[in-house]
Regions:
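Asp-based, Mg2+/Mn2+-dependent phosphohydrolase catalytic module
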Residues: 1-2, 119, 124-217
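N-terminal helical cap/lid subdomain that shapes the substrate entry/recognition surface
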Residues: 2-95, 105-106
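Conserved SAM-binding loop
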Residues: 12, 111, 170-171
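Hydrophobic residues in well-ordered beta-strands that form the structural core
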Residues: 14, 113-115, 191
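Alpha-helix N-cap/helix-start and coil->helix boundary motif
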Residues: 19-20, 46, 50, 98, ...
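Surface-exposed alpha-helical segments enriched in charged/polar residues
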Residues: 28, 99-102, 106, 159, ...
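Well-ordered alpha-helical segments embedded in enzymatic catalytic cores
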Residues: 96-100, 153-156
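Substrate-recognition element of Asp-dependent hydrolases with the DxDx(T/V) motif
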Residues: 97-127
Length: 217
């Protein structure tokens, strides 16, 4: 059985509604309602926060000051995303996820987390949602400012559990990130709620982990 790399948002944690709400508040606050949010969100919803905010700044003609972009990238999470999760007590992982973790542990199959989230969100995932029960925080790969893109994140996530991404199964929901997993070298991908027939590396599509065929892992 191959080692496994999990994405988080949209894969282990179904938060599309939370992210859209948080981004809507953030973009409206920055632009004072002058930007067509739905149009820009369609194009940039799967990108890293910094890239999304940078694009908004460009649209508005604002100077691309790194500290200001970082401020808004973090504010989207700490002011809006975190608040929504806590006010609505959103902390349940995707159905079947914890059962899969238990199975992997019992069978001594290495696994790790690879997320484009920033540190502030990783803190929420571990301390509020409870990922600390299942993952080694020191080994996960996230947007700590050292990665150029998710391609390098995938490779690092695999290396930190003693393997290579070419040897792993990746669970991922975003078609953009699935393409990056392929570019990183992964040829064994299980897609969550998304499918592209042109990506031959996708071996199964599931709505959640209760539909997973363990025999293909």
């Amino acid at each position: 059985m191959r080692p496994i790399i999990f994405d988080y948002n949209g894969t282990l944690f179904f938060d599309a509604d939370i992210n859209e709400w948080a981004w809507r508040q953030t973009v409206n606050e920055i632009s004072k309602g002058t930007i067509d949010f739905d149009e820009v969100y369609k194009e940039f919803k799967s990108t890293r926060n910094y890239i999304f905010i940078e694009h908004i700044f460009k649209m508005l003609g604002y100077p691309l000051e790194e500290d200001r972009i970082n401020y808004w990238a973090k504010r989207k999470e700490t002011e809006y995303y975190h608040r929504f999760c806590k006010e609505h007590n959103r902390k349940e992982l995707a159905p079947g996820a914890e059962e899969l973790f238990a199975y992997l542990r019992e069978n001594k199959i290495p696994y790790n987390l690879c997320t484009a989230s920033i540190k502030e969100n990783v803190d929420l995932y571990f301390d509020f949602v409870g990922l600390n029960k299942w993952f080694d925080r020191e080994k996960i790969a996230y947007d700590d400012g050292t990665f150029e893109n998710k391609i390098s994140m995938y490779r690092a996530a695999a290396e930190r559990i003693g393997t290579k991404i070419e040897c792993c199964t990746v669970f991922e929901d975003s078609l953009k990130s699935i393409s990056e997993a392929v570019k990183a070298g992964c040829s064994h991908i299980i897609a969550i709620r998304n499918y592209d027939p042109d990506i031959k590396e996708i071996i199964q599509v599931i709505n959640d982990f209760t539909e997973l065929d363990y025999s293909i892992l």
